[in-house]
Amino acid sequence: MPEGKKRSLIERLNKGPVICAEGFLFEIERRGYMSSGEFVPMVSLEHPEALENLHRDFQHAGSDIVQAFTYNGHREKMRVIGKEELLEPLNRSALKIAKKVALDTPKGIEPNLMAGNISNSNIWNDKDTSSNSEVEKMFSEMVGWAVDEGADILIGETFYYAEEAYAALKAMKQSGLPSVITILSLIHI
């Protein structure tokens, strides 16, 4: 493959495993750039260099995908902490940082894919669906920003409800980008 050429997610999967580093929230907290509580990824605005360094650490550890750290960076979490006006700048900053790192791989290494990210909403309620249309709008706006900033794929992660994961997947599929969903079971075995 010519240097600098980037294969799609499907092309990579057809050749073998694809690694996507996870654990941003806890690692950023461990490094002192986030305190427990609402776990909103303000690091992309307040300490962008720390986020870039973490992406590079994951990249050097073998991650094939640089995932934008927008986990919990949705309208509801921003409303709760009184910073809803920073929602779009936070998301776009995280996406730009991820894109920068994805395009700047070490010499001889295939460029990483950059993933836009959405997560559970904390307000989805399978028994009272009145808030679910708000969640769908939150997913759509985050997907839109990821597309605008040049994401190669989308990842929806840590959904507790299958219905919410399906709503996320529906919004993600409208982008035309390859999409991956992860679901966290609340049933303890």
Question: What feature does the model see in each segment?
Answer:
Residues M1-P48:
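N-terminal basic, low-complexity leaders that serve as flexible interaction/assembly modules and, when applicable
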Residues I19-A21, V66-A68, M114-G116, L154-G156, ...:
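Hydrophobic faces of well-ordered beta-strands that scaffold small-molecule active sites
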Residues E22, F58, A98, L154:
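Conserved, mostly hydrophobic/aromatic
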Residues E38-E46, Q59-A61, I65-L90, A151-Y166:
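Glycine-rich, proline-tolerant flexible connector loops at the mouths of alpha/beta enzymes
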Residues L51-L54, L87-V101, V135-E149:
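An active-site-proximal structural segment forming one wall of the substrate-binding cleft
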Residues H60-A61, T105, I109, N125-L184:
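Alpha/beta enzyme core
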Residues Q67-K77, A115-D126:
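Substrate-binding cleft and catalytic face of glycoside hydrolase catalytic domains
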Residues I187-I189:
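Conserved small/polar residues in nucleotide/adenosyl-binding loops
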